[in-house]
Amino acid sequence: MAIVKVKPTSPGRRAMVKVVNKDLHKGKPYAPLLDTQSSTAGRNNNGHITTRHKGGGHKHHYRIVDFRRTKDGIPAKVERLEYDPNRSANIALVVYADGERRYIIAPKGVTVGQQLMSGSEAPIRAGNTLPIRNIPVGTTIHCIEMLPGKGAQMARSAGTSAMLLAREGTYAQVRLRSGEIRRVHIECRATIGEVGNEEHSLRQIGKAGANRWRGIRPTVRGVAMNPVDHPHGGGEGKTAAGRDPVSPWGTPTKGYRTRSNKRTTSMIVQRRHKR
């Protein structure tokens, strides 16, 4: 991968920094693993905005990614690496010995032609997926399941990883990039190594229109609105909010915790927040 600073031929390109990977496939994606994807623009089934700053953007297909990696004992060869518009990480198209093709999250260091395995007998090598009970303590892992068989849910973004800290009985402790230490069942699966495309965070969008292509709409400050639109709105000229920061619905923001899932609180050994 290379970090390319674009020539300043316009104000938008002057600040642009791109991450170029010449190893990515330049053709069309593998059609049998594509699915249609409709845009909701941040609305729920009632038409109410549940996620702000979403809407528009370029249409794209969803790539069906295998987060379970359940074809145990069958070797798979990396056929090509591809760009995925739905996530920050790149994806890899792998072809198994029985001829089946699947997309997986592309791990760091995995190249075209490399052989990957999954299952309890797989070697400890980047890109291989094993149950946590078979992974040595201290190993860097990614694409971690939270429930056995549900599929990977943690450490899937570009450049992310976690570390297996300990195993106690039927549970293991995993430290995430955020600093949170979480308990995970030892039958949950994880992939060895880090997620690739680690230079994703170094890119610079360059102009507002590039975010509009991605379906991200502008973020308007509450103090710039009218009182009918936001608790911070109103006033003559430029004024302060006049109260502690809140969301448009009056919920405290900037550090206020909104987690309410008490059912899984026992799985968190150490929170990511500093007390």
UniProtKB/Swiss-Prot annotation:
Residue ranges with Basic residues bias: 50-59
Residues annotated as signal peptide: none
Matches recorded under SUPFAM superfamilies: Nucleic acid-binding proteins, Translation proteins SH3-like domain
Keyword rRNA-binding: yes
Biased composition (Polar residues): 35-46
Any GO BP annotation: cytoplasmic translation
GO cellular component, one term: large ribosomal subunit
Keyword ATP-binding part of the UniProt annotation: no
Keywords assigned: Ribonucleoprotein, Ribosomal protein, RNA-binding, rRNA-binding
GO function terms (MF aspect): rRNA binding; structural constituent of ribosome; transferase activity
Pfam families: Ribosomal_L2, Ribosomal_L2_C
Region (Disordered): 28-59, 224-275
Record NCBIfam families: rplB_bact (TIGR01171)
HAMAP family assigned to the protein according to its UniProt record, in alphabetical order: Ribosomal_uL2_B
Annotated function: One of the primary rRNA binding proteins. Required for association of the 30S and 50S subunits to form the 70S ribosome, for tRNA binding and peptide bond formation. It has been suggested to have peptidyltransferase activity; this is somewhat controversial. Makes several contacts with the 16S rRNA in the 70S ribosome.
Family: Belongs to the universal ribosomal protein uL2 family.
Subunit structure: Part of the 50S ribosomal subunit. Forms a bridge to the 30S subunit in the 70S ribosome.
Protein name (database record): Large ribosomal subunit protein uL2
Lineage per the UniProt record: Bacteria, Pseudomonadati, Pseudomonadota, Betaproteobacteria, Burkholderiales
